[in-house]
Amino acid sequence: IGTPGDKLDVLVAMNPAALKTNLADLKTSGIIIANKANYTDKNLKLSRWELNPLEDDSLRDYRVIALDMTRLVSNAVEDMDLSVKLISRSTNMFALGLVSWMYDRTLDPTINFIKNKFAKRPELVEVNIRALKAGYNYGDTIEEFQHIITVSKAEFEPGVYRNIVGNQALCFGLITAAEKAGLDIYFAGYPITPASDILQILSGYKNFRVKTFQAEDEIAAIMSVVGAVFCGDLGITATSGPGMALKGESLGLAVATELPLVVLNIQRAGPSTGMPTKTEQADLLQTLFGRNGESPVVVLAANSPADCFSTAFEACRIALEHMIPVVVLSDAFLAHGSEPWLIPQTKSLPKIRTHLVEKPNG
């Protein structure tokens, strides 16, 4: 699983209040870039710092780079007739230029943004671009940084790409699997963040023989899916951690009756009801063992928003070909994160074999 994590590597603190508010988000040994021109006695008092943190040892666990951005921007635009207020408001571009140098990022996209943003104010275009370049050049000339961090360009396979978010990719994978299996989709769910929009997305694809049902609770949702699978549909439900706990008994029934349903667990943080808008990957053991008796299920986990497509397709294939429930683990970060997705050629995907009973026994 690839994730940027929850902690910052670099914190730009333009004033004492910003430092106090955001310091907890900076990882130990992270870099603090501060505009010391704003660390005045008045600002320190307003933000409840007893001493100037740039001058005592309270930030000893971090690497502090304190510089007078206001003066440096003033020097960069000294030939322009600008107010002190306007110069101060441009210091953020100085900081952005410095960070761009630290991460070896070209300034061209930012310069184009500035030109478009302030197209009707040429003086703002000029001062912001000068401040941006001043910050970039400052990083290139001082000796505070031993090395820069180069983020190389992504290498893409040839083909047609589109931007896709994780939950959308899951839906496309389910629909593609149903087409390859020659089955209708029956999806039932109860609204729960961050899985709710799967129901909303699938509801827009009735032309692909997708039937959707918003149930009154989590148990009703999965039990209706059990019934739909028994009648020959590709049955799917989606939930998050709290709903997964409620679905346990019904999932055990699907195991006992060898019904190939698919459960999408879009994980969120915390026990019990949890935190709807926070992400976590803590439901693996619950998914593997959170049912009474011998009730094994196949568990797959996506590793990126684009991979959600392949994971959903594979989940349906395994479920239908081996007559067993499959649980797909995603999370809020993947569900709402986006990335370029290589649209696969339909012929490159395998046909899915089904085991539908078409005539009476005997």
Language-model features, listed with the residues they occupy:
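Conformationally flexible catalytic loops at phosphate/diphosphate-handling active centers
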Residues: 140-151, 155, 326-362
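Active-site cofactor/cluster-binding pocket
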Residues: 1-181
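Conserved thiamine diphosphate
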Residues: 59-72, 278-327, 331, 354-358
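Glycine-rich, charge-decorated loop segments at or immediately adjacent to ligand/cofactor-binding or catalytic sites
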Residues: 42-48, 76, 248, 271-278, ...
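Short beta-strand segments
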Residues: 13-15, 33-35, 65-68, 239, ...
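A glycine-rich phosphate-binding loop feature that marks nucleotide/adenosyl-phosphate handling sites
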Residues: 114, 131, 152-156, 191-194, ...
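Acidic, Ser/Thr-rich peripheral helices and adjacent loops at domain boundaries
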Residues: 42-59, 280-288, 345-361
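Thiamine diphosphate
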Residues: 1-27, 172, 177, 185, ...
